[in-house]
Amino acid sequence: MFRYSKRLMTALLVLVGLTAAACSTASSATTAGACPPQKSPVVTLAAYSTVYDVYGKLISAFQDQWKQAHGGQQVIFQTSFGGSTTQAQNVASGFPADIVALSLAPDVEIIQKAGLITHDWTTDPDGGIVATTPVVFDVRPGNPKHVVDWNDLTQAGLQILTPDPSQSGGAKWNIVAAYGASLRGKVPGTPATTSGAQALLTGIFKNVTVMDKSANDSLKNFQSGNGDVAVTYENQVLTAIAGGKSDQEVLPPSTVLIQTPTVVVDRNARKHCVLPIANAFVQFLHTPDAQTIFQTVGYFRPIDPAQAQKGIADLKQQPVQDLFTTDDIGGWDQLVNTTVFGPNGAFTQALKAAKG
């Protein structure tokens, strides 16, 4: 039997409703008569750790729209939040998610390889990406350690928090951000070569004191007083600041644009007779209404990289001098399998050197 990990939470159970529209309007992927009428269909969402609040708002907005359009039928959402890679592994191992909201594309591929996502999710609107945000530094008030760029993370005695890349998608983004900035020749004193990027990562990870299970755990650890700087999602820092926390954002001159996909796990959704609802929810995330929620509640940037680079003044998002994507530095397949996370990749070797 599949067991929930301690970081997985279930929430947002709303119990009323009347119709069976979810199954009676099933797509061609669901055979006629296969789904009995459902009074209150249940959709399960597994998501990465830092989007709890924004997905609560998105789910509520979708439920209202669905109810109005489908004769008062109330859709129930069960949600689970944790490190992105851990979530993907759990779904591949049997957690019955109908939809996954993950930090990065390679985590979706874990579920694809398990045969649970059978469609080409990259043909969805915006290539399946629903929200974006850059990697930034979260520092103490006044930035007493004067951390402004990636090379500053190598200074002697600095204490850095970043999650564990074996469990957290955000951790992988943090590593790719430093690697890419170096490779693009944007880090002072660091050669724009693979060896230069590896040396930078070695220096950074010599100063990493804690690698938590998720970006959310890492930020909470930092907010409890541990460390001098946390490397994390910008939207996470801005959300904390908006909530009255003393976090302070430092946006490095060169950083990666995190692109987060949300995808229907179609084999599960079909089995649970909620495929039309799951599809509708994912499509809803690309609408102007949902994108406004992502930006004003979640402090994400616009999906378009050019617009994301400019930032949004009202949300206190600064422009980025050099905002790049994974495609600009070889793409995820190359980054995961060879150049960064492969057996001889820059991070793999840097971590060995840092520990040695």
Ranges and model annotations:
Residues 142-148, 167, 180-189, 268-278:
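Short helix-loop capping/hinge motifs at secondary-structure junctions, enriched
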Residues 24-26:
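Bacterial signal peptide processing site
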